[in-house]
């Protein structure tokens, strides 16, 4: 059964909880925060179907907030698939990842955010 490719062309914003400690298991201490950034990129690329992933400065500060060794266990992130305005861009869509305002994760799954 083939997936419908036309769905990946629409703009959408979703809110996810990413479990970083699960993704950083058996990583040496001095590589935890850089690997966490790479894992967030990989996660966003997978769920949104775009290879162009851009991270917000606030997200980077949230990952590095407790230093290089002690990254947050879970992080609530907002991923937006947006249209690329560059004429010479390889892809027509890109993903923009930022940190969610509400960091509580209890009872929250994936939420589609309605743009106002």
UniProtKB/Swiss-Prot annotation:
Pfam families: Ribosomal_L31e
Gene Ontology molecular functions: structural constituent of ribosome
Keywords: Ribonucleoprotein, Ribosomal protein
SUPFAM superfamilies: Ribosomal protein L31e
Gene Ontology CC terms: ribonucleoprotein complex; ribosome
Keyword Ribonucleoprotein in annotation: yes
Sections of the chain in a coiled coil: none
PANTHER family linked: 60S RIBOSOMAL PROTEIN L31 (PTHR10956:SF0)
Full protein name: Large ribosomal subunit protein eL31
Organism: Chlamydomonas reinhardtii
Phylogenetic placement of the source organism: Eukaryota, Viridiplantae, Chlorophyta, core chlorophytes, Chlorophyceae
Underlying gene: RPL31
């Amino acid at each position: 059964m083939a997936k419908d490719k036309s769905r990946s062309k629409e703009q959408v914003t979703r809110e996810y909880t990413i479990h970083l400690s699960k993704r950083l298991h058996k990583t040496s201490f001095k590589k935890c925060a850089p690997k966490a950034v790479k894992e967030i990129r990989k996660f966003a690329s997978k769920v949104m179907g775009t290879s162009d992933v851009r991270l917000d400065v606030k997200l980077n500060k949230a990952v590095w907030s407790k230093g290089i060794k002690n990254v947050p266990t879970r992080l609530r992130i907002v991923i937006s698939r947006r249209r690329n305005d560059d004429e010479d861009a390889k892809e027509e869509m890109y993903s923009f990842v930022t940190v969610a305002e509400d960091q509580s994760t209890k009872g929250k799954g994936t939420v589609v955010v309605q743009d106002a």
